[in-house]
Amino acid sequence: MMFSKPVVLATTALATFAAATPLVARTEPTCSSTEIKCCENVGTAAVVSSVLTPILVSIPLVGPLLSLLGLNAVVALLFGTVDVVLGLTCSGIDVGGSCNAQTVCCENVQFNGLINVGCVAIDIL
């Protein structure tokens, strides 16, 4: 019983803080120039499957899972959803450089840069 008051106080404080924190909709991706990628293939797993499948097969332990479970199950397992937008065959863009494919900003990079996850198409001037 001695710990009940601190626990109630901490829980109340956290709930108050969470309720007071405003939610802000993201309309533009926040991406620094070092995170901008030029990707030849951008889309969901279904859209980029012909490029994604050989990449996944080449990754140890993922290849056998792909054979057992199929592409959608492996993508959901690795990235949380089959609807995540992936960037494949990507390279960085130097300041002042150009991109002859799709310019994207991606939330994170997986498998040493082979797969860029959570990508949003952007326009650069």
From Swiss-Prot:
It comes from the Eukaryota. Disulfide bonds join 31-105, 38-99, 39-90, 106-119. CDD domains: hydrophobin_I. It is found in: Secreted; Secreted, Cell wall. GO terms for molecular function: structural constituent of cell wall. Keywords: Cell wall, Disulfide bond, Secreted, Signal. SMART domains: HYDRO (SM00075). GO terms for cellular component: extracellular region; fungal-type cell wall. Residues 1-20 form the signal peptide. InterPro entries: Hydrophobin (IPR001338). Its main location: secreted. Aerial growth, conidiation, and dispersal of filamentous fungi in the environment rely upon a capability of their secreting small amphipathic proteins called hydrophobins (HPBs) with low sequence identity. Class I can self-assemble into an outermost layer of rodlet bundles on aerial cell surfaces, conferring cellular hydrophobicity that supports fungal growth, development and dispersal; whereas Class II form highly ordered films at water-air interfaces through intermolecular interactions but contribute nothing to the rodlet structure. Self-assembles to form functional amyloid fibrils called rodlets. Self-assembly into fibrillar rodlets occurs spontaneously at hydrophobic:hydrophilic interfaces and the rodlets further associate laterally to form amphipathic monolayers. Belongs to the fungal hydrophobin family. This is Unclassified hydrophobin 8. It comes from Pleurotus ostreatus (strain PC15) (Oyster mushroom).
